[in-house]
Amino acid sequence: MATLDAIREALPEPARDIKLNLQAVLQPGTLTPAQRWGVAVATAAAARNERLLAAVLADARAEVEPAVVEDALAAAAVMAMNNVYYRFRHMVGKASYAEKPARLRMNRLVKPAASKVDFELFALAVSAVNGCETCVRSHEQVVVAGGLSEDQVHEAVRIAAVLHAAAVSLELAGYAAVPSAAAAAG
């Protein structure tokens, strides 16, 4: 995790908790390395911070097969589309929209390069970051039915939460050095 260590060091003091959590959530736990790093890659991509994504990709590529990284990136891309679409349908709450076919291609969801259950876990984590209740519920059911435990789901969402917070914190790093209005006036 040498590259992520550099990210942790770049986080500003207000993100001290995120520094500590970033180190902790990527340690071995209930998830396999492929699951842990796939979730990290997918959620770093969903967080849209190039620096974080580059660091996570570098560390992940040293730990897992290329197919896992490819699936994680594909999950982030597919869920960027699906989370908007299904969140809209859920928020509007009209049966007429729910009856309309999505007509959105999602072939990778059906035929991932590596593990189907892992791909669904990556999609679940991205959906949590993107706030799509419908997708979170759907993917959670699939991964549990596929043999993952609630502890594994919980661990994946913890990783997603911390990676998202790290992306936000990296953005804050640029503002931490900016003097406040009160300090500038004084």
Swiss-Prot record:
Catalytic reaction list: N(6)-[(R)-dihydrolipoyl]-L-lysyl-[lipoyl-carrier protein] + a hydroperoxide = N(6)-[(R)-lipoyl]-L-lysyl-[lipoyl-carrier protein] + an alcohol + H2O
Enzyme Commission no: 1.11.1.28
Pfam families (alphabetical): CMD
Biological process (GO), any one: cell redox homeostasis
Active site: C132 (proton donor), C135 (cysteine sulfenic acid (-soh) intermediate)
InterPro entries (alphabetical): AhpD (IPR004674), AhpD-like (IPR029032), AhpD_core (IPR004675), CMD-like (IPR003779)
Domain of life, per lineage: Bacteria
Database matches in Gene3D superfamilies: AhpD-like
Disulfide bonds: C132-C135
GO molecular function: alkyl hydroperoxide reductase activity; disulfide oxidoreductase activity; hydroperoxide reductase activity; peroxiredoxin activity
Keywords: Antioxidant, Disulfide bond, Oxidoreductase, Peroxidase, Redox-active center
PANTHER family assigned: ALKYL HYDROPEROXIDE REDUCTASE AHPD
Family the entry assigns: Belongs to the AhpD family.
Physiological role: Antioxidant protein with alkyl hydroperoxidase activity. Required for the reduction of the AhpC active site cysteine residues and for the regeneration of the AhpC enzyme activity.
Protein name, as recorded: Alkyl hydroperoxide reductase AhpD
